[in-house]
Amino acid sequence: MFTINLLLYIIPILLAVAFLTLIERKVLGYMQFRKGPNMVGPYGLLQPFADAVKLFTKEPLHPLTSSTSMFIIAPILALSIALTIWTPLPMPNTLLDLNLGLIFILSLSGLSVYSILWSGWASNSKYALIGALRAVAQTISYEVSLAIILLSIMLINGSFTLKTMSVTQENFWLIITTWPLAMMWYISTLAETNRAPFDLTEGESELVSGFNVEYAAGPFAMFFLAEYANIIAMNAITTILFLGPSLMPNLSHLNTMSFMTKTLLLTMTFLWVRASYPRFRYDQLMHLLWKNFLPMTLAMCLWFISLPIALSCIPPQM
């Protein structure tokens, strides 16, 4: 029974990731006035399965100078963390109802740094190591802004439980009242998932492919799956925090459809950003966080802390 539950949990996420790669290639294709993949199956719908078969049937090679055990563990850890992040998400029901769901998600996203660092270090390649160091610095930096934004949202929500967010947003979405936080959160999730225009970890012109340059076949596919699973998970969290998952007890299937639609639209925006914007320079990336986002998020957090205290001092009106 445990195995069946595990498969029912993992397979839909992996299928969503597989078709996200197809959607990305199609969207980028049409934005660049070309078709995208259209040969494998009708309209190219079987392309993800062809890619999976190709990657997982090739021989997984590793450099002679690499640290073998760490080199193998890194992609497994990356995919495991990416799949575990989904457990406390209410869609509309959770797999694991945690009281500290948001702290759990923040901790796991912090752990994902280790898989990147290990892969860069174990590859014993200067390109992989530079890519890994960039990724670690970027991820750790943007987690600061993500944590402060989450703290502000939790002050509004009054709980660290994700399920209560739908009750908090019963009358209106939080994106309406906290739109500066929502904008900073969305940009920070782009940086956290190493997506364009913050994809400095895989700057093709200087680092070839970044921290996974020495990976091939199955292990490379695991990193790929982990990256796209994180993208969908981050957009699902954005939907829960700012776009109020619907609360209709009698129409639970509509709740799920609404949640999926919002998440898909946010994910499509990720692809739109990739097609539209050039890559940031590294110093611009860091200045954006430390000189712009950090002061603004701290100011907003102090505002949400001080507002209830200030209002509680007002004497009751007759």
UniProtKB/Swiss-Prot annotation:
Q: At the top level of its lineage, which domain of life is listed?
A: Eukaryota
What GO molecular function terms would the record report?
NADH dehydrogenase (ubiquinone) activity
Give the intrachain disulfide bonds: none
In UniProt terms, what function does this protein have?
A: Core subunit of the mitochondrial membrane respiratory chain NADH dehydrogenase (Complex I) which catalyzes electron transfer from NADH through the respiratory chain, using ubiquinone as an electron acceptor. Essential for the catalytic activity and assembly of complex I.
GO BP of this protein:
mitochondrial electron transport, NADH to ubiquinone; mitochondrial respiratory chain complex I assembly
Q: Which catalysed reactions does the entry list for this protein?
A: a ubiquinone + NADH + 5 H(+)(in) = a ubiquinol + NAD(+) + 4 H(+)(out)
List UniProt keywords, sorted A-Z. Electron transport, Membrane, Mitochondrion, Mitochondrion inner membrane, NAD, Respiratory chain, Translocase, Transmembrane, Transmembrane helix, Transport, Ubiquinone
GO cellular component terms, A-Z: mitochondrial inner membrane
Known EC number: 7.1.1.2
What is this enzyme's class at the first EC digit?
Answer: translocase
Q: Does the keyword Membrane apply?
A: yes
Give the UniProt subcellular location, in the record's own words.
Mitochondrion inner membrane
Q: Which gene encodes it?
A: MT-ND1
Q: Please give the chief subcellular localization of this protein.
A: mitochondrion
Assembly and oligomerization: Core subunit of respiratory chain NADH dehydrogenase (Complex I) which is composed of 45 different subunits.
How does this chain sit within the bilayer?
Multi-pass membrane protein
Q: What is this protein called?
A: NADH-ubiquinone oxidoreductase chain 1
Membrane-traversing stretches: 3-23, 70-90, 100-120, 136-156, 172-192, 223-243, 251-273, 294-314
